[in-house]
Amino acid sequence: MKFLAFALETNRWKKINGDYRMKKYLGGCHCGKVQYEVELNLKNAISCNCSICMKRGSLLDFIPESQFKLLCGENELQDYLFNKKLIHHYFCKNCGILSFGKGIAPGGTKEVVAINLRCLEGINLKTITIKEYDGKSR
Ligand SMILES: [Zn+2]
């Protein structure tokens, strides 16, 4: 299964289990130039072993664009594209931290935002189920 498809499947799973309580969180880079607000259910995170996720160490969750609001730092974002150039890996030009990325959902035109959960404020990673995704062999 492709990465984004897997991510969306994970999100559907949350809904099916009736635990789809959304909460607002603030997130951003390290220096604070990039800040955003997201609405999500912190239940699962995806840990991927592909070339970039491995080096970055990010824990990801995927949400529709409508649940994401960039508060500041649009001009501080540097886009990094590689491989099939489908996912925009946005990182802060000043501190280098990637707090989110964007891509198009499989078979559609809908934009999906990948949130690096490590960049959210006031969360406890120990309460989140980590799902492994084998991006390396795809
Ligand atoms: Zn920064």
Predicted regions: what is each one?
Residues 13-28, 33-138:
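A short Gly-Trp-Pro
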